[in-house]
């Protein structure tokens, strides 16, 4: 089983599936924004950035998964992005489930001055929605609740694949 897990991270197909799943989520977010007319809030924008981190990890892993340093860089980016995405989605769910004048998100994105993504790519990163508003549901779960499940799944798969790569084996030097 460990050998199988090590082999997964050493193949482009697995990294491609990771990138494709994140690309699907990004395209879905743009569909919700531009076709259905839902306005992204600050937390939505940050969650998009976390998904872009997972997408970037998948693309980095596809470059040369047999090279340990690229594989581990992709794994670390994947793990960090999934973890931060889960934190953000949980906080976003808290804003929605416990609305209060004292529990609100900022109306402005707080990107570093050296990377003002909301100014560089406003069509993707400009927030103009309300974090506590539930404007869409599927199977009675809001979008941030679905993102909790998605980021938790990304994190779980990351942990399993990473454990497989930490254990010494005969594969994938």
Curated annotation (Swiss-Prot):
Localisation: Cell inner membrane
Record GO cellular component, one term: plasma membrane
Keyword Glycosyltransferase: no
Membrane topology: Multi-pass membrane protein
Family annotation (Gene3D superfamilies): DsbB-like (1.20.1550.10)
Cytoplasmic domain ranges by topology: 1-14, 66-72, 165-173
Transmembrane segments: 15-31, 50-65, 73-90, 146-164
UniProt GO MF annotations: electron transfer activity; protein-disulfide reductase activity
InterPro entries assigned: DiS_bond_form_DsbB/BdbC, Disulphide_bond_form_DsbB, DsbB, DsbB-like_sf
Residues in the Periplasmic compartment per record: 32-49, 91-145
Cysteine disulfide links: 41-44, 105-131
One GO-annotated biological process of the protein: protein folding
Keywords: Cell inner membrane, Cell membrane, Chaperone, Disulfide bond, Electron transport, Membrane, Oxidoreductase, Redox-active center, Transmembrane, Transmembrane helix, Transport
Matches recorded under PANTHER family: DISULFIDE BOND FORMATION PROTEIN B
NCBIfam families the record matches: PRK01749.1
Family statement: Belongs to the DsbB family.
UniProt cross-references to HAMAP family, sorted A to Z: DsbB
Record's function text: Required for disulfide bond formation in some periplasmic proteins. Acts by oxidizing the DsbA protein.
Name under which the protein is recorded: Disulfide bond formation protein B
Organism: Aeromonas salmonicida (strain A449)
């Amino acid at each position: 089983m460990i050998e199988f897990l090590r082999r997964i991270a050493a193949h482009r197909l697995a990294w491609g599936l990771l990138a494709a799943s994140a690309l699907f989520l990004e395209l879905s977010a743009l569909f919700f924004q531009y076709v259905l007319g839902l306005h992204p809030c600050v937390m939505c924008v940050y969650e998009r950035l976390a998904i872009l981190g997972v997408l970037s990890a998948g693309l980095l892993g596809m470059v040369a998964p047999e090279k340990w340093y690229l594989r581990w860089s992709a794994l670390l980016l994947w793990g960090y992005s999934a973890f931060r995405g889960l934190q953000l989605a949980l906080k976003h769910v808290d804003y929605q489930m416990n609305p209060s004048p004292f529990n609100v998100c900022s109306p402005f994105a707080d990107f570093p001055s050296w990377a003002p993504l909301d100014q560089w790519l406003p069509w993707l990163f400009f927030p103009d929605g309300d974090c506590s508003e539930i404007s869409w549901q599927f199977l009675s779960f809001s979008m941030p609740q679905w993102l909790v499940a998605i980021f938790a799944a990304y994190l779980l798969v990351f942990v399993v694949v990473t454990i497989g790569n930490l254990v010494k084996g005969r594969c994938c030097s």
